Design a protein with these regions (language model features):
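One-carbon transfer enzymes
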Residues: 1-304
């Protein structure tokens, strides 16, 4: 292994990828399109672009809990490990820099989530989980951690003075700058953007109560440092390049935003952190295809 490369770890929640239908073909404007996950995109970029000279992927860590009935239900189409002939979040034979991606998977289950929110021992359980996660990151030698779709808030792991302070970055499917009219923080970022394109703002996610607002028909993605807030860390790169149609479905918008904003933000953010300034305008080299290009390719596929 090239010791000059920065060692990457990737942390995600399979239950989030399952909600996105990662690794599946989804309905799209009367046709079908493949839902590539940010992880699969990153692997392609490491294999086929200059990012591969700067980084090596050492581990993919997921926090899903096989002992939780809720988690089992959410990932039931996939399971917690690939089974021959079954669905998976990416092509099961996928390799990254000469190694099978499936061989890099590590589960660090966030079992504290089984406890009620007001349980007295829940904070200690969360602390124990973060300690286990830190141990795993240290064991695999992680020097930079990319977080994508992790459905929990990290706290102790990202505090100043800890080994991974400012070494953990999040790729978020929305603009996270509070001063932006396109700001979409939190777990509902994509749905929030979809409502915004219809001239509505959800003011209560429990009841889905809305109020009218001026139409905001663009969204994007932010690549930012992690702190212990909700998508509140310092922004490294923003990409605002996703047009929203008022009739888009959530998966159509997800597909568009991945392709047009999130994948470029991930590429450009990692390039900037590696000091590869000349690559910042070269995210197209990572084979991010526009919606029209991808649609033409897949229409031809399904017409065969």
């Amino acid at each position: 292994m090239d010791m000059s490369k920065t060692k990457l770890a990737y942390i995600c929640s399979f239950r989030n990828a399952a909600a996105d239908k990662a690794g599946q073909y989804v309905e799209y404007k009367g046709g079908r399109r493949y839902m590539k996950s940010p992880l699969e995109y990153l692997v392609e970029a490491l294999n086929g672009t200059k990012l591969g000279a700067a980084y090596s992927l050492e581990a993919v860590i997921f926090d899903d809990d096989g002992g939780s009935a809720r988690d089992r239900e959410k990932v039931k189409e996939y399971g917690f490990s690939y089974q021959p002939g079954g669905l998976w979040f990416y092509p099961p034979e996928l390799e990254v820099q000469g190694r099978r991606l499936n061989d890099l998977l590590h589960g660090v289950p966030s079992v504290y989530r089984r406890l009620p929110l007001d349980a007295a021992d829940r904070p200690a359980g969360k602390s124990a989980f973060e300690a286990c996660l830190q141990d795993k990151l240290l064991t695999v030698g992680a020097e930079l951690v990319v977080v994508d779709g992790l459905l929990i808030i990290l706290d102790e792991l990202v505090r100043p003075g800890t080994p991974f302070h400012r070494k953990m970055v999040n790729i978020h499917p929305g603009i996270t700058r509070l001063d932006s009219p396109h700001e979409r923080r939190g777990a509902y970022a994509t749905l929030d953007a979809l409502y915004g394109a219809r001239g509505l703002k959800v003011v209560n996610w429990a009841t889905m109560e809305t109020k009218p607002i001026p139409v905001v028909d663009m969204t994007g993605a932010s690549f930012h440092y992690m702190d212990n807030g909700v998508d509140s860390g310092e922004v490294i790169v923003d990409v605002l390049n996703t047009k929203i149609g008022p009739q888009d479905t959530i998966l159509e918008l997800r597909w568009n935003n991945f392709s047009n904003s999130l994948f470029p933000a991930l590429y450009q953010g990692l390039a900037q952190m590696a000091g590869m300034r000349g690559m910042l305008a070269d995210s197209g080299a990572a084979k991010v295809r526009s919606c029209d290009e991808q649609g033409a390719m897949e229409s031809a596929f399904w017409a065969r």
